[in-house]
Swiss-Prot record:
The keyword Nucleotide-binding applies. The keyword Chaperone applies. Induction: By stress conditions e.g. heat shock. Residues 490-508 have a biased composition (Basic and acidic residues). Residues 595-608 have a biased composition (Acidic residues). HAMAP family: DnaK. Acts as a chaperone. This is Chaperone protein DnaK. The modification Phosphothreonine is found at residue 172. Residues 490-509, 576-608 are annotated as: Disordered. The lineage of its organism: Bacteria, Bacillati, Bacillota, Bacilli, Bacillales. Residues 576-587 have a biased composition (Low complexity).
Length: 608
């Protein structure tokens, strides 16, 4: 059985880890970094992922960032007339992480544990699983990010702990409360906001810069796409800088042009101003934190440790807010960017049998139920119920001789059905005619360990049953996923072919250059016939490089290589002959001298 890798598929950055020798280790990517930007760019037929895609985002409109915010929705991205779902874009990122893991391990990787925000609903979880499948990964488990962080933090802790995990990433926020003891990781409560993260802090800075520039120059940079991308990069950098210093200078020369010529943006952002701009965002994280504690029936004094996860927790105001609320210093012993991937790798180790004596008890983040008479949401499974779990309840018909019942499956906390998230609908038909309230319809909810929901309805009178596994609301069916899998594989092959072509062209180009240099350097030592032969082979290679026939390039390269080799061998043989002829006389003299020296040595030897 191969390794099960752990993947933190983040909004702004992603990370991959694996268990090695009983330890979870982060795998560096091909560029040598431990995290990979969750950015995908399309340039003609080529797909770029990570740092290389992020770097050219300013000039390439076909660059997609923060796609995780759209997981589980019907949102699509248009690239040159072709539509991509969030699952397909996420799959491209996952393919890159899979390839980096394979290069590191030296073996094929087909299985993974992928993390999601604890507050992801069923559609978002299913979409994440589909993305894995499209990328060629069998997703063995979907686990919550805070739970993964607790695994990475608490695997070697023997004593009982109650910990609060505060996870503020690039696009999502979660808070979870866990109890750790004897290898059992039990999630007691979870809360969060899937539309809050580091991107929102960046946006506050961007809005401020745009407003200040407009005040000064009368030009709205918010309408200039290229300027906005430069502002985004500058805002992100300033935010990071302000975690370590009290003021950051933002300098963007030639940001736009006015009537008098080019205009530059020069501004200093202080930490105090940044905290003023983002105070409402920090406060938005505290409401779910208070709710999670309340759901767990705990007070801040009951907490043993506070663990901060996600790059945005480096913001001093965030650390101060959590410290002021809990009256505890957050634990700094884990890398907030890597801890989730490490935890996912540990869960992979548990599933593979490499990690023993660890039990993970996660919870469902939102209540589940069905719509009943009057548009009411009737809950069957309450939020923060430990999963996997199963619950059933008996319902009846609302009208006489009702032949069928519609089962409207919902997820959320609101009392009325329309205010909650629809997970799916299905129908139980062929109910025998009977007065209202007589038929007995048993509705059963099952939630598996991935947090994915299965619902069935059964007429207890006839034993007729109908069931549904909730698909993501984006409505991608199995056939569509299979098509995407094949497309992703084809693109991976195309990427490899492009890489091979680039390498072949580079090698041929270098050989042409080396041939030119060799002919010049050797000069008169090359016979005219050999020179002409080499020139002809070189021109053939140059002509082949101008075309698109790879086989022709390969053939021309091989021919040129053989000609150059033959030419250099001839020259070196000729040079060796010349040196042999020139060195014959001095050699004879040396021999005479040698005899004298030998005689001396013999005398010395005789004396010994």
């Amino acid at each position: 059985m191969g390794k099960i890798i752990g993947i933190d598929l983040g909004t702004t950055n992603s990370c991959v880890a694996v268990m090695e020798g009983g330890e979870a280790v982060v795998i560096s990517n091909a560029e040598g970094n431990r995290t990979t930007p969750s950015v995908v760019a399309f340039k003609g037929e080529e797909r770029q992922v990570g740092e290389v895609a992020k770097r050219q985002a300013i000039t390439n409109p076909n660059t997609i960032q923060s796609i995780k915010r759209h997981m589980g929705t019907s949102h699509t991205v248009d690239v040159d007339g072709k539509k991509f779902t969030p699952q397909e874009i996420s799959a491209i990122i996952l393919q890159k992480l899979k390839k980096d893991a394979e290069d590191y391990l030296g073996e094929s990787v087909t299985e993974a544990v992928i993390t999601v925000p604890a507050y992801f609903n069923d559609a978002e979880r299913q979409a994440t699983k589909d993305a894995g499948k499209i990328a060629g990964l069998d997703v063995k488990r979907i686990i919550n990010e805070p739970t993964a962080a607790a695994l990475a933090y608490g695997l070697d802790k023997g004593e009982d702990h109650t910990i609060l995990i505060y996870d503020l990433g690039g696009g999502t926020f979660d808070v979870s409360i866990l109890e750790l003891g004897d290898g059992v990781f039990e999630v007691v409560a979870t809360a969060g906001d899937n539309r809050l993260g580091g991107d929102d802090f960046d946006q506050k800075v961007i809005d401020y810069l745009v407003a200040e520039f407009k005040k000064e120059n009368g030009i709205d940079l918010g309408k200039d796409k290229m300027a906005l991308q430069r502002l985004k990069d500058a805002a992100e950098k300033a935010k990071k800088d302000l975690s370590g210093v009290t003021s950051a200078h933002i300098s963007l020369p030639f940001i736009t042009a006015g009537e008098a010529g080019p205009l530059h943006l020069e501004m200093t952002l202080t930490r105090a101003k940044f905290e003023e701009l983002t105070a409402d965002l920090v406060e938005r994280t505290m409401e779910p934190t208070r709710r999670a504690l309340k759901d767990a029936g705990l007070t801040p004094s009951d907490l043993d440790k506070i663990i901060l996860v996600g790059g945005s927790t480096r913001i001093p105001a965030v650390q101060k807010a959590i410290h002021d609320f809990t009256k505890k210093e957050p634990f700094k012993g884990v890398n907030p960017d890597e801890v989730v991937a490490l935890g996912a790798a540990i869960q992979g180790g548990v599933l593979a049998g490499d990690v023993k004596d660890v039990v993970l008890l996660d919870v469902t983040p939102l209540s589940l139920g069905i719509e009943t008479m009057g548009g009411v949401m009737t809950k069957l499974i309450d939020r923060n119920t430990t999963i996997p779990t199963s619950k059933s309840q008996v319902f009846s018909t609302a009208a006489d001789n009702q032949p069928a019942v519609d089962i409207h499956v919902l997820q959320g906390e609101r009392p009325m059905a329309p205010d909650n998230k629809t997970l799916g609908r299905f129908q139980l038909t062929d109910i025998p005619p009977a007065p209202r309230g007589v038929p007995q319809i048993e509705v059963k909810f099952d939630i598996d360990a991935n947090g994915i929901v299965h619902v069935s309805a059964k007429d207890l009178g006839t034993n007729k049953e109908q069931s549904i596994t909730i698909q993501s609301s984006s409505g991608i069916d199995e056939a569509e996923i299979e098509r995407m899998v094949k497309e992703a594989e084809a693109n991976a092959e195309a990427d490899n072919k492009r890489k091979e072509e680039a390498e072949l062209r580079n090698e041929t180009d270098q050989l042409v250059f080396a041939t030119d240099k060799a002919i010049k350097d050797l000069g008169e030592q090359v016979e005219e016939a050999d020179k002409e032969k080499a020139e002809a082979a070189k021109e053939k290679a140059k002509t082949a490089l101008e075309g698109s026939d790879l086989e022709a390039i390969r053939t021309a390269k091989d021919e040129l290589s053989a000609v150059v080799q033959e030419l250099t061998q001839k020259v070196y043989a000729k040079m060796a002959e010349q040196q042999g002829a020139e060195g014959a006389e001095p050699q004879a003299e040396a021999k005479q001298d040698d005899n004298v020296v030998d005689a001396e040595f013999e005398d010395l030897d005789d004396r010994k």
